[in-house]
A protein has these predicted regions:
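Extracellular secretory-pathway ectodomains and N-terminal mature segments of eukaryotic proteins
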Residues: 1-145
Length: 145
């Protein structure tokens, strides 16, 4: 129990819910991050895996911030996809809160992608969760692209 805290956040794979008494509309939260990762390391070259993971996340970021998307539709500020890594596939997903501008979504996603080495260096899966944006990647499918 947290009697003096009135904010809450719940993260799911396809959405997240953030409730706060602090006015956060159109603002990026740069203070709160939660890092989660798979306990297993990748077999093989970790540097190459990290590079491929960052490339997938960068590609998904560009997809998530497409300006031609209609605001507040199902895929607005959201992207999921996969990348072939030889005989294996890498799956990823990212999203921003829909109150952010496209520019602020991009800034937020850049800030969490930059956390990748700290969070998930060479891990088979990982997440960086933030009240304004989030990403996840795994070596198994966890959302529909």
């Amino acid at each position: 129990r947290c009697p003096n805290n009135r904010g809450r956040i719940i993260w799911y794979d396809n959405c997240f819910l953030y409730i706060s008494e602090i006015y956060t509309y159109e603002k990026i939260d740069f203070k709160h991050y939660l890092y989660l990762h798979n306990a297993k390391d990748v077999s093989g070259n970790k540097k190459l895996f990290n590079k491929n993971t960052k490339a997938l996340l960068d590609k998904l970021k560009e997809k998530a911030i497409r300006k031609e998307q209609e605001p507040y539709t199902r895929d607005y500020m959201y992207a999921a996809g996969e990348e072939s890594l030889g005989t294996t596939k890498l799956y990823g997903m990212m999203q921003c809160t829909q109150d952010l501008s496209v520019k602020n979504c991009s800034v937020c996603l850049d800030s969490i992608i930059a956390k990748l080495p700290r969070c998930c260096n060479g891990k088979q899966g990982g997440r960086v969760l933030n009240p304004s944006c989030t990403f996840r990647y795994e070596l198994y499918p966890f959302v529909k692209p």
